Amino acid sequence: MKYFEFTFDTHPCTETVNDVLAAVLGEAGFESFVEREGGLTAYIQQSLYNEETLKTELANFPVPDTEISYTFAEAEDKDWNEEWEKNFFQPIVIGDRCVIHSTFHQDVPKAEYDILINPQMAFGTGHHETTSLIIGELLDSELTGKSLLDMGCGTSILAILARMRGAKPCTAIDIDEWCVRNSIENIELNGVTDIAVSQGDASALQGKGPFDVVIANINRNILLNDMKQYVACMHPGSELFMSGFYIDDIPAIRREAEKHGLTFVHHQEKNRWAAVKFVL
């Protein structure tokens, strides 16, 4: 699968600007991001790139007085472990109970759940607010013996943690070939079983389930579009956790969820990002 590598320069270059830029680029089809001095490096499948879409998204950038410029070239088809080392991917501890690190890390903190991740083209290492929010939800949930779906699984970090916490069986689905390959590698690294990984979008859910727990950490538009398909593979009492959007998006997410019979339980937030929990 061929990718373009984009280098975005932002002024001012702040954490907020970079977070919003990553979200905006996600709406334009970009799927992988690396923070760099002065902005972001981002990746998109060549077959999905649309110049007009990108220009429109940047023209409507929601942070006032932000200047954004970019260049791009064809990306090498390679393993991204070395790139993450260069970009200071450090071990992260979430909730004092879960540590996420890679094979190249030394002096890793001890925690109840130790997860190994070797990222390739899938960026789900626990560092982003949305991933850490869902991890926090999983740490606070009773998962033993529950069937679980990780939709838009990325590195499958969430499915791996859920399996470690007793969820069984687990299903992990992602539209991206790299994510599927990386998920399989990460599952093997962690020595967990009963996680079935497959490639596809929400249409791949037809005939699957019902699941006791569904996780979808993607983005606002995909969640709004695909929520009815998540509900179709749930049963009364199933839990749905969603993230990948901002606090301001919660009302739209709630309206769509309630149209499909879901009941809002609570939300969590971190640096303007949100995660929500619903029950069917």
Curated annotation (Swiss-Prot):
Gene Ontology CC annotations of this record: cytoplasm
Keyword Iron-sulfur among UniProt keywords: no
Annotated InterPro entries: Ribosomal_L11_MeTrfase_PrmA, Ribosomal_PrmA_MeTrfase, SAM-dependent_MTases_sf
This protein's UniProt keywords: Cytoplasm, Methyltransferase, S-adenosyl-L-methionine, Transferase
GO molecular-function terms, A-Z: protein-lysine N-methyltransferase activity
Location, primary (coarse class): cytoplasm
Pfam families cross-referenced by the UniProt entry: PrmA
Uppermost EC category: transferase
Residues that bind S-adenosyl-L-methionine: 131, 152, 174, 217
Function: Methylates ribosomal protein L11.
UniProt record similarity statement: Belongs to the methyltransferase superfamily. PrmA family.
PANTHER family xrefs: ELECTRON TRANSFER FLAVOPROTEIN BETA SUBUNIT LYSINE METHYLTRANSFERASE (PTHR43648:SF1)
Protein name: Ribosomal protein L11 methyltransferase
Source lineage: Bacteria, Pseudomonadati, Bacteroidota, Bacteroidia, Bacteroidales
